[in-house]
């Protein structure tokens, strides 16, 4: 890495209501140095608990809470669980393709997902320009893993940051009425992609044990969590 982690400039946001845990406040540390905006540097930053939103690189830095733990899957060591194998079997008619751009009909699917699953979230109401600001960056390769059914109908898109040694599951949206767990299938297909491309790690963002919606991440073995600046698991 071209910049020593101990000497990067960090800015702290003000405290504001936590997006995941009611009655708590969150604060994030933001990396301010623009020279960090490279693939090599970002891989090191992710290994130290950072993540991005648009071009902003950040990590949780809350005063009275450490519930957010970075989590990643060791791709060569991944072994699907029995339930994941059943899901793969049920979804064997589906197929995926990693693309550099979104399919033209992506926004209809994204809108349905936001309206039915996240109407009370920060992405509501769904807007194309807001989605672009959230997902796009000028210094990193981002792919869009499209999942289709047997008739080539678009079911899901897993936005994926792609680097030399790892990938990062950035954001996924899907058909909220489809009977299979497309969120879990999205990660399984991202793992297939990582295995094919010889990536060492798939980062899943932050795990919050007290947030039930996030606990699917812990079902992927072997995973590691960053606790007290050491990867464990």
Curated annotation (Swiss-Prot):
It is found in: Cytoplasm. GO terms for biological process: ubiquitin-dependent protein catabolic process via the N-end rule pathway. It catalyses: N-terminal L-glutamyl-[protein] + L-leucyl-tRNA(Leu) = N-terminal L-leucyl-L-glutamyl-[protein] + tRNA(Leu) + H(+); N-terminal L-aspartyl-[protein] + L-leucyl-tRNA(Leu) = N-terminal L-leucyl-L-aspartyl-[protein] + tRNA(Leu) + H(+). The keyword Coiled coil does not apply. GO terms for molecular function: arginyl-tRNA--protein transferase activity; leucyl-tRNA--protein transferase activity. It comes from the Bacteria. Keywords: Acyltransferase, Cytoplasm, Transferase. Belongs to the R-transferase family. Bpt subfamily. HAMAP family: Bpt. PANTHER family: ARGININE-TRNA-PROTEIN TRANSFERASE 1, ARGINYL-TRNA--PROTEIN TRANSFERASE 1. Functions in the N-end rule pathway of protein degradation where it conjugates Leu from its aminoacyl-tRNA to the N-termini of proteins containing an N-terminal aspartate or glutamate. This is Aspartate/glutamate leucyltransferase. The lineage of its organism: Bacteria, Pseudomonadati, Pseudomonadota, Gammaproteobacteria, Vibrionales. The gene is bpt.
């Amino acid at each position: 890495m071209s910049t020593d982690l101990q000497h990067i400039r960090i800015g702290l946001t003000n405290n504001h209501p936590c997006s995941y845990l009611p009655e708590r406040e969150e604060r994030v540390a933001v990396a301010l140095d623009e020279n960090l905006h490279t693939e090599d540097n970002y891989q090191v930053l992710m290994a130290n608990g950072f993540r991005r939103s648009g071009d902003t690189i950040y990590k949780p830095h809350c005063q009275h809470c450490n519930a957010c733990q970075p989590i990643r899957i060791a791709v060569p060591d991944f072994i699907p669980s029995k339930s994941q194998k059943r899901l793969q079997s049920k979804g064997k008619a589906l197929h995926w393709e990693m693309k550099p751009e979104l399919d033209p009909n992506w926004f209809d699917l994204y809108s349905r997902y936001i309206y039915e699953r996240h109407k009370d979230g920060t992405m509501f109401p769904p807007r194309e320009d807001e989605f672009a600001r959230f997902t796009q960056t000028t210094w990193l390769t981002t792919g869009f893993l499209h999942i289709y059914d047997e008739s080539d109908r678009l079911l899901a898109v897993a936005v994926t940051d792609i680097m030399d040694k790892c990938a990062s599951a950035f954001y996924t949206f899907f058909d909220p009425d489809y009977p299979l767990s497309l969120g879990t299938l999205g990660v399984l297909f991202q793992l297939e992609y990582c295995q094919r491309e010889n990536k060492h790690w798939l980062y899943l963002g932050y795990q919050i044990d007290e947030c039930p919606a996030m606990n699917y991440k812990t079902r992927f073995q072997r995973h590691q969590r960053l606790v007290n600046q050491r990867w464990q698991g």
